[in-house]
């Protein structure tokens, strides 16, 4: 069967890979010039380094993401040290259980549903009981393109997956309750026996107009609102003396501030500079500031928490604003996330915003892909 996957983020990549592993012919359509969606590396010639668009951390229960890494051959590039450190202003540190779970991204508590972290905790505890290991947070030891994309490209070449860049899908075509193909924004029609739509919630409007019940799916757009994350890749002239690979700054200005030591995480040679990355979640205010102001804010913060950062000089600063990083689920919107199965035969949804056991995470993206692929494989096996 010819399957079309719309969107080349983790959910689309995993869908394309697993459909091709099941023997189907797959075309992957991505509107940008590169794959990876919200998980990408950004090579920086000026410092001859490859930082990411933002630090991504893993939780020990990420079974579907691990399945994806098995498919692309990079499972060994994720490390679970079993600890994170909480750092106090002035430099004191604590290693705590809080550090393990607080590594996951957060939104402002006054505007987001308490059900989301509660569900996350339940999922984490269930996975920990199932695998008989304590919940822990891990990190990639390579950049995100090496982790997610390079191996996927090889697997696509082996499995005959066609990847089309700058292919913007305008709509899914439905005939007599069955999917018939997709239409690109330049009018080209691509016929398909099955389609997985793996675009983010903020891009889904208009794509499913021919799907019965699409109004209900589009309701999610109002309730799952984008949360900005600002990351700053700081190349400094000296070590700031982090004791752990990742540290959560206790009592920071925003919802959650974290600092990452790429020397420890990537076994990076620091002879030319020391690379630290900072992450500010729910950075609604910070994202409005200039790059110079953001860098200054982050350096001030490092100086408050790390005595060794007092005299540090910035060799290069790289600010990454991601205004649509994750989504916040507003109170009262439980049940708003749609199932992967749609009312149209041969059409499934994927993406971190569709209904999974997780909130907006890489694991949610991959779990949604696994479920969407199951829907399509069921359909492929039905007699027609
Ligand atoms: C800075 C940052 C930090 C994060 N930290 C973590 C973390 O620590 N742990 C964690 O688990 N998660 C984290 N996340 C969240 C995680 O990255 C996302 O949940 C996940 O990558 C979403 O994958 P996706 O495939 O659902 O969507 P996306 O990655 O957004 O992929 C969707 C793709 O669809 C394409 N597309 C959209 N519209 C169209 C169209 N009409 N036609 C064709 N293509 C289209 C887009 O260009 C994109 O490539 C973080 C995200 C960010 C940005």
Regions found by a protein language model. Give the residues of each.
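Mobile amphipathic helical/loop "lid" adjacent to a hydrophobic cofactor/ligand pocket
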Residues: 65-134
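N-terminal Rossmann-like FAD-binding beta1-loop-alpha1 element of flavoenzymes
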Residues: 1-28
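Active-site/ligand-binding neighborhood in enzyme catalytic cores
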Residues: 106-175, 180
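Conserved flavin/dinucleotide-binding core of flavoenzymes
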Residues: 241-248, 252-384
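Mid-domain catalytic core of redox enzymes
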Residues: 168-288, 300, 304-305
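Glycine-rich FAD pyrophosphate-binding loop
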Residues: 20-45
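Conserved FAD-binding subdomain of flavin-dependent enzymes
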Residues: 38-41, 46-80
């Amino acid at each position: 069967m010819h399957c079309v996957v719309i969107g080349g983020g983790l959910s689309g990549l995993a869908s394309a890979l697993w459909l091709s592993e099941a023997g189907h012919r797959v075309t992957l359509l991505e509107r940008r010039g590169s794959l990876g969606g919200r998980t990408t590396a950004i090579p920086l010639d000026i410092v001859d380094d490859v930082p990411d668009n933002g630090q991504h951390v893993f939780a020990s229960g990420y079974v579907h993401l691990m399945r994806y890494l098995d498919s692309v051959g990079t499972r060994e590039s994720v490390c679970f040290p079993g600890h994170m450190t909480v750092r106090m202003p002035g430099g004191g540190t604590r290693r705590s259980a809080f550090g393990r779970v607080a590594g996951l991204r957060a939104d402002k508590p006054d505007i987001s549903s308490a059900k989301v972290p509660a569900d996350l905790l339940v999922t984490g505890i269930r996975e920990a009981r199932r695998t008989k290991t304590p919940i822990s947070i891990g990190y990639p030891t390579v950049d995100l393109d090496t982790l997610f994309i390079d191996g996927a490209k090889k697997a696509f070449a082996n499995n005959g997956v066609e990847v089309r860049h700058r292919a913007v899908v305008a709509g899914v075509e439905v005939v007599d309750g069955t999917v018939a193909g997709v239409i690109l924004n330049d009018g080209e029609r691509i016929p398909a026996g099955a389609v997985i739509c793996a675009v983010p919630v903020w891009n889904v409007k208009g794509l499913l107009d021919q799907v019965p019940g699409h109004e209900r799916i589009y309701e999610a757009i109002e309730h799952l609102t984008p949360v900005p994350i600002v990351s700053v890749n700081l190349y400094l002239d000296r070590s700031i003396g982090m004791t752990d690979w990742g540290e959560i700054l206790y009592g920071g200005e925003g919802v959650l501030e974290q600092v990452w030591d790429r020397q420890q995480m990537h076994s990076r040679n620091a002879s030319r500079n020391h690379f630290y990355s900072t992450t500010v979640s729910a950075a609604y205010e910070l994202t409005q500031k200039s790059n110079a102001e953001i860098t200054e804010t982050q350096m001030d913060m490092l100086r408050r928490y790390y005595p060794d950062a007092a005299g540090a000089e910035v060799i290069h600063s790289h600010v990454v604003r991601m205004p649509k990083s994750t989504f916040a689920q507003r109170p009262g919107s439980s049940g708003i996330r749609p199932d992967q199965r749609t009312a149209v035969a041969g059409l499934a949804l994927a993406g971190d915003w569709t209904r999974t056991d997780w909130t907006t995470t890489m694991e949610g993206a991959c779990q949604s892909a696994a479920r969407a692929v199951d829907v399509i494989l069921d359909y492929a096996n039905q007699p027609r």
